[in-house]
Protein backbone atom coordinates (compact mmCIF):
# COMPACT_ATOMS: atom_id res chain seq x y z
CA UNK A 1 0.00 0.00 0.00
CA UNK A 2 2.77 2.46 0.91
CA UNK A 3 4.69 1.56 -2.25
CA UNK A 4 1.63 2.41 -4.36
CA UNK A 5 1.19 5.72 -2.54
CA UNK A 6 4.86 6.57 -3.12
CA UNK A 7 4.37 6.08 -6.84
CA UNK A 8 1.23 8.22 -6.93
CA UNK A 9 2.85 11.03 -4.95
CA UNK A 10 5.99 10.83 -7.10
CA UNK A 11 3.74 11.35 -10.12
CA UNK A 12 2.13 14.41 -8.53
CA UNK A 13 5.56 15.89 -7.76
CA UNK A 14 6.84 15.09 -11.26
CA UNK A 15 3.80 16.79 -12.81
CA UNK A 16 4.33 19.92 -10.70
CA UNK A 17 8.00 20.03 -11.72
CA UNK A 18 7.19 19.34 -15.36
CA UNK A 19 4.99 22.45 -15.43
CA UNK A 20 7.85 24.52 -13.97
CA UNK A 21 10.99 23.57 -15.91
CA UNK A 22 13.21 25.94 -13.92
CA UNK A 23 12.43 23.98 -10.73
CA UNK A 24 10.56 24.56 -7.49
CA UNK A 25 11.24 24.78 -3.79
CA UNK A 26 9.91 22.17 -1.39
CA UNK A 27 7.19 24.58 -0.28
CA UNK A 28 6.13 25.32 -3.87
CA UNK A 29 5.99 21.61 -4.73
CA UNK A 30 3.86 20.82 -1.69
CA UNK A 31 1.44 23.60 -2.61
CA UNK A 32 1.26 22.68 -6.32
CA UNK A 33 0.86 18.95 -5.66
CA UNK A 34 -1.38 19.48 -2.61
CA UNK A 35 0.69 17.18 -0.38
CA UNK A 36 2.08 17.27 3.17
CA UNK A 37 5.71 16.90 4.32
CA UNK A 38 5.50 13.14 4.83
CA UNK A 39 4.16 12.57 1.33
CA UNK A 40 6.70 15.00 -0.15
CA UNK A 41 9.61 12.97 1.21
CA UNK A 42 7.98 9.68 0.23
CA UNK A 43 7.58 10.82 -3.37
CA UNK A 44 11.01 12.44 -3.49
CA UNK A 45 12.61 9.20 -2.36
CA UNK A 46 10.98 7.44 -5.30
CA UNK A 47 12.09 10.11 -7.79
CA UNK A 48 15.63 10.24 -6.41
CA UNK A 49 15.99 6.46 -6.55
CA UNK A 50 14.95 6.55 -10.21
CA UNK A 51 17.31 9.51 -10.84
CA UNK A 52 14.48 11.67 -12.19
CA UNK A 53 15.29 14.83 -10.18
CA UNK A 54 18.19 16.97 -9.00
CA UNK A 55 18.08 18.42 -5.49
CA UNK A 56 20.06 21.36 -4.15
CA UNK A 57 19.82 23.76 -1.24
CA UNK A 58 19.04 27.39 -2.03
CA UNK A 59 18.69 29.92 0.78
CA UNK A 60 18.42 27.06 3.31
CA UNK A 61 15.50 25.48 1.44
CA UNK A 62 15.35 22.40 -0.78
CA UNK A 63 15.21 23.23 -4.48
CA UNK A 64 14.19 20.49 -6.93
CA UNK A 65 14.22 20.29 -10.71
CA UNK A 66 13.80 17.53 -13.26
CA UNK A 67 16.90 16.01 -14.84
Model segments located where?
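A short, conserved structural fragment
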Residues: 48-58
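Short loop/turn and capping residues at structural boundaries
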Residues: 28, 41, 58-59
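Short amphipathic alpha-helical interface segments
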Residues: 6-32
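N-terminal leader/targeting helix
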Residues: 24-25, 56, 64-66
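Short amphipathic alpha-helical interaction segments
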Residues: 35-46
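Alpha-helix N-cap/helix-initiation sites
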Residues: 3-7, 22-23, 37, 55
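Short alpha-helical segments that sit at the start of domains
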Residues: 1-14, 60-62, 67
